[in-house]
Amino acid sequence: MYQLNVPLKNDAHTIFIEQGISQKLTSLLNENKDYSHIFIITQQSILDHVDTSFLSDFPIIIIGEKETSKSIGSAESVVQQLIVSGCDRDSLLVGFGGGTVTDLVGFVSSIFMRGINHVFVPTTLLGMVDSAIGGKTAVNSSSARNVIGTFKQPRAIYIDPLFLTTLPSREIIDGFAEIIKYGLIVDCDLYNMIESDFQTLIDLKDLSQIESIIQACCQHKVNFVIADELDQNQRMMLNFGHTLGHALESYFNYKTITHGQAVYYGMLGAAFISKKYNFLSEDAFNRIHAFISTIPKLNFNNIDCNKVFECIKYDKKKTKNKFNFIVLTDIGKADIFYKITSDDFKEAINYIANYEYSCN
């Protein structure tokens, strides 16, 4: 079993990665005899597609399937179910699912009785390499993504790569958006490997190789979290592609575009701005452009660029009327750019809207 320690001063915990670790979950959770109750919070689709016999000892709370379920209303619904079920400050919440589940469970954990413990068992690739790690919790408002949230570290994270074999290929491709992000901002070797063997990787032909990639991404995320837990400086690098990506998700009302697709488009737009200001060379930009163009995408023929820009105005990374925008200086290197203008955003959105996408 691979173990990655997260040595935060007040909230140290461990990430456990192993194929089949989910089958040990009951014994792992019961190792701590101090928990009065253990509650599993998940989605029905996960219960329908994953062997969850190992969860039979615990009560289960079901939340909605869509990104729109990540809301204050959903959080209140979970809180009410916890109250009725006798949850107290010595209870443990288990977020079993993808990013929607872990974001919501982390948020509920941080506010219920002013904070109780939680652990994560991510079932999606995106969750395993990104959203379950780092302590950010969030729900969406009616107009913007992730603008209501807290910081609350989990007590542990249990990652079972075998869950990936239950996912449709679209979700694997979506998860690779975050992996490619790590490659672009901090790990050129990782990017080179993905670029050269992308189809084999998304087909999950070698799950041990995928497990190694997950380990590398977890280490990168942990490094950023240790350096900047509260997202004031270096951790902002992880937002590469997300300012534009979140705006697209909001524009489409979280319905016709997935988070992974939005991040792919957002990274293209961010690379475009990086090239515009000569942070990124033409050759590097063309290489990124060519690679991402091979990934199935949506048709944006009728996108309203001005309305997408309006969505950017609500981005949580905005401070004092400035955006902390992440640019690439090379493949594997990034920096924070503070002088981005509204015209830059509009040009990038227009570039995305008019990009020649070809679906595989």
Where do the model's predicted regions map?
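Non-catalytic interfacial helical region
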Residues: S77-F96, V105-F120
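Short glycine/serine/threonine-rich phosphate/pyrophosphate-binding segments
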Residues: T100-F107, M128, A247
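Generic secondary-structure signature for well-ordered alpha-helical cores
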Residues: V84-C87, Q153-A156, L162-S169, A177-D189, ...
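Active-site segments that bind and position negatively charged phosphate/pyrophosphate groups
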Residues: D197-N306
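ATP/NTP phosphate-donor binding region
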Residues: M1-L92
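Residue-level signal for inorganic ion chemistry
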Residues: E18, I40, P122, D160, ...
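C-terminal charged capping/lid subdomain of soluble metabolic enzymes
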Residues: Y2-L4, A12, I179, F279-N360
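A glycine/threonine-rich phosphate-anchoring loop and its flanking beta-alpha core
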Residues: F16, F107-Q199
